[in-house]
Structure formats: C-alpha cells, structure tokens
A protein has these predicted regions:
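An N-terminal assembly and electron-transfer interface module characteristic of large anaerobic redox
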Residues: 1-199
Length: 199
C-alpha cells in the first residue's frame, strides 16, 4: 500500500475512512512517543529490563485502544500520551552520561530494526544512547518543503496553504505530548518545524 500526497500510485480495494485515518494518526503519535521515551530511558535504567517492561505494558494498552473499530476518544488519547511520558520519566535512572548517537537516513532503514541491522541495540550495547527523530518530523518536513516549492519552484499557493494547515494540525495533534515532555525531568520537547528550518 502506498500513501502519498501526489497520487503516484492507486490502491484498489483500499479505502481511507475517517476512522482509519484517525486510528493511523494516533498510532503514529504513540509510536513517536514510545520511541522518544524508550530510547532515552533504556540506556540508563537502574533495573535491567524495566524500560522494556514498561513499554510492553503501555504497548498493549495502546493496541487495545487504537485497535478499536470505533471513532476514538481524543480526550483519552491525550491522557494516554501524557501518562506514558510520566511513567517513563519516573522510571529509576542512573546519573551517568553516555554519548548520544543520531540515527538518520531513509525512512524504512531508520525505523525498521531488521532493515538497519538492529543499530539501536548495537549502539546501546556499546554504551551509547540512540537518538532517532520522530516520524512526524519527517511528515512535517515534507509539508514545510511545500513553502519552498511554492516560493521558488512554481508550486501553487493553494498547495502551500494546504500543507501549512497540515503542519498546524500535526502540531495540535502532538501538543499534549510536547507539553508533557517539556515538564519532564529527562526528556526534551519536540521542536517546531519552523525552528530547524531556519538553520
């Protein structure tokens, strides 16, 4: 299945419904939150295996929530995002400092352990902390790039407006997670796409 904004491929028999879109967006944000929390905490856990155990506990709850066929409660989604971050933030951690290593590259290779030879596990076994950008950040980059295309490469002003609306939507969707990350002891909040774009 290919989902893209420019209609490169059609998917006969596959229909995007409002419910499916909502479930997919919530799953996306839960995945980003899990990745950000787990990779930050696991290298410093005082009790070996505690970060993975907490991840498994919350993963089951998230699957039960997102796996529901109905339209989901946005209030419950927001509450779950905040509670996941709080639980990871309160996991006992050591005070040691480890080198932080960024994992970047093509989307599939970056996010699928089997495609990157389990690079995060390797980095952690070698005494490092892996840092993987959120998948939402990639989507925001794609949307923000439309500004450049409209300003310099002949893309339409309408496409620019639509993509800027999408940016505001994604930022709204992860607002609760960002606010909770900002209040935490161990995490950094997600950046707004406009900030790295200025660099």
């Amino acid at each position: 299945i290919s989902i893209n904004m420019v209609g490169l491929e059609k998917n006969p028999g596959f229909k995007l419904t409002p419910s499916l879109i909502q479930h997919g967006l919530y799953a996306l944000e839960f995945g980003d939150t899990f990745m950000r929390c787990l990779y930050r905490v696991r290298p410093y856990e005082k009790v070996p295996g505690s970060a993975n155990a907490l991840h498994e506990k919350w993963k089951k709850r998230v699957i039960d929530f997102v796996g529901n066929t109905k339209i989901l409660s946005h209030r419950k989604y927001r509450k779950m995002c905040r509670q996941i971050i709080r639980d990871f933030d309160n996991l006992p951690m050591t005070d040691e400092k480890k080198p932080r290593v960024g994992v970047v590259g093509e989307i599939l290779v970056k996010f699928l352990p089997a495609a990157n030879n389990y690079i995060v596990d390797l980095l952690e076994s070698e005494g490092a902390e892996a840092v993987v950008p959120d998948l939402t950040d990639f989507l925001l980059y794609c949307c923000y790039n439309q500004n450049f295309k409209a300003d310099y490469l002949g893309a339409t002003a309408k496409s620019k407006r639509i993509n800027n609306m999408l940016i505001r939507f994604f930022e709204w969707l992860r607002k609760d997670a960002r606010d909770e990350l900002a209040k935490s002891k161990h995490f950094e909040p997600t950046a707004y796409i406009q900030d790295p774009a200025k660099i």
